[in-house]
Amino acid sequence: MFNLPYHCKALLTAKQERGLTFDDVAKAINKPEVWTTALFYGQASTDKSTAEAILKALGGEQFWTDYNDRLEAGQEKIDIRRVLNGLSGNGEENMGVKGMVTRGATFEVPPKDPVLYRLYEVLVVYGYSYKALIYEKFGDGIMSAIDFRTSLERKKDPKGDRVVITMDGKFLPYSDPSAWGTQ
């Protein structure tokens, strides 16, 4: 597996061992599915109570104890404290800054994975169209990826099911030079 933080590998292992989907976990913690998935891949951090709820949804302490007991000699045991700390922004991957996440560190450009490459291709092909339409409809600015929501749905279609990805970001206008003052 590519270079994921320690806690992410543990979370993904637990999810797979328990036969859960990201949607199952998201519903158990009452959070959006895509955001929950981002946590599992180290692209977000959360508060301690949500981190604890995730661990509970994955089977609680008993799961981790049972999992560690099944390991063979030489395999690394999962330290539940490290997982909890990583989720809540206190892990070693946070580089000494609580909650700091190195977003995009697991991503290469262009991506080699076919699904990720298709998403990259969408931006390569339609990126300037999105940019032009944002400008025409909103003015000079950007779509925030900070004040942002996203979702993914499956849509039935007679020609084959469709993937519907929604990106919902706040429009942020660039400042007018008159607001800069004089130097």
Swiss-Prot record:
GO terms for biological process: cyanate metabolic process. SMART domains: Cyanate_lyase. Keywords: Lyase. It holds the Pfam family CYNS_N. Its EC number is 4.2.1.104. The active site is at R118, E121, S144. This is Cyanate hydratase. Belongs to the cyanase family. The gene is CYN1. The keyword Mitochondrion does not apply. It comes from the Eukaryota. It catalyses: cyanate + hydrogencarbonate + 3 H(+) = NH4(+) + 2 CO2. One of its GO terms (molecular function) is DNA binding. InterPro entries: Cyanase, Cyanate_lyase_C, Cyanate_lyase_C_sf, CYNS_N, Lambda_DNA-bd_dom_sf. SUPFAM superfamilies: Cyanase C-terminal domain, lambda repressor-like DNA-binding domains. The keyword Lyase applies. Catalyzes the reaction of cyanate with bicarbonate to produce ammonia and carbon dioxide.
